[in-house]
From Swiss-Prot:
Entry GO MF terms: RNA binding
Modified-residue entries (N-acetylalanine), positions: 2
Protein name per UniProt: N-alpha-acetyltransferase 38, NatC auxiliary subunit
The encoding gene: NAA38
Organism of derivation: Homo sapiens (Human)
Key words, A-Z: Acetylation, Coiled coil, Cytoplasm, Nucleus, Phosphoprotein
Homology family: Belongs to the snRNP Sm proteins family.
InterPro entries membership: LSM_dom_sf (IPR010920), LSMD1_Sm (IPR034110), Sm (IPR047575), Sm_dom_euk/arc (IPR001163), snRNP_SmB/NAA38-like (IPR050914)
Main location per the UniProt record: cytoplasm
Function: Auxillary component of the N-terminal acetyltransferase C (NatC) complex which catalyzes acetylation of N-terminal methionine residues. N-terminal acetylation protects proteins from ubiquitination and degradation by the N-end rule pathway.
Amino acid sequence: MAGAGPTMLLREENGCCSRRQSSSSAGDSDGEREDSAAERARQQLEALLNKTMRIRMTDGRTLVGCFLCTDRDCNVILGSAQEFLKPSDSFSAGEPRVLGLAMVPGHHIVSIEVQRESLTGPPYL
């Protein structure tokens, strides 16, 4: 994704999609905090829908595509995805392989980057 512009790195804390069951009583504010944190996380994910992402995987491959959805196991679905192989001593990275729709298992994700331009959107006239 050469020349695609600056990116913003997203990092997960304590597991990307973990959700704890809350056994809160009427006077328990911990349940309310968990609900509001879950709501904020959902809103942040919704804001990333249809944005261009670069996902680095444990085997060295990189996938670039449009973020379509995720699930509670942290699997990610990318649309219009392209796969870039990790360059090694025996060969250099060539043309990307077009995958189209791709599911990336959450346990293979090392990092996710979002293209900054796709976050702000193009200027409208």
